[in-house]
Amino acid sequence: MAAEIPTSVIQKLVFFTGAMIIFPIFTFFVCQYLFSNNALISGGIAALMANVVLIGYVVVAFTEDTSSLADEKVETKKDI
C-alpha cells in the first residue's frame, strides 16, 4: 500500500534539495572572494541564503493546488 505521490511534488523536492545544497555553498565562496576571506560575513550570508531557499520551499508547498488530489480520492471511494 504505497502512497501515490505526484511527480510534480517529487520534482519540487529534488529542486529545492539541490538548491539547499548548492546555493549556500556557492554564496559562501563568492562572498569569501568578494569580502577578502572574511568567514564570519560569508557564513552569515550563506546561512541567510539557506533560509531563503527554505522559505521558498514552504511558500511553494502552501500554494500547491491539492484540490485535484482530493477529488481523485473521493472518486475512488465512490467506486468501491
From Swiss-Prot:
Key words, A-Z: Cytoplasmic vesicle, Endoplasmic reticulum, Membrane, Transmembrane, Transmembrane helix
Bilayer disposition of the protein: Multi-pass membrane protein
GO biological process: vacuolar proton-transporting V-type ATPase complex assembly
Lumenal compartment spans: 36-39
Keyword Cytoplasm listed: no
Localization per record: Endoplasmic reticulum membrane; Endoplasmic reticulum-Golgi intermediate compartment membrane; Cytoplasmic vesicle, COPII-coated vesicle membrane
Transmembrane regions listed in the UniProt entry: 15-35, 40-60
Disulfide linkage: none
InterPro entries: Vma21
Family as reported in the entry's similarity comment: Belongs to the VMA21 family.
Record's protein name: Vacuolar ATPase assembly integral membrane protein VMA21
Source organism: Scheffersomyces stipitis (strain ATCC 58785 / CBS 6054 / NBRC 10063 / NRRL Y-11545)
UniProt gene name: VMA21
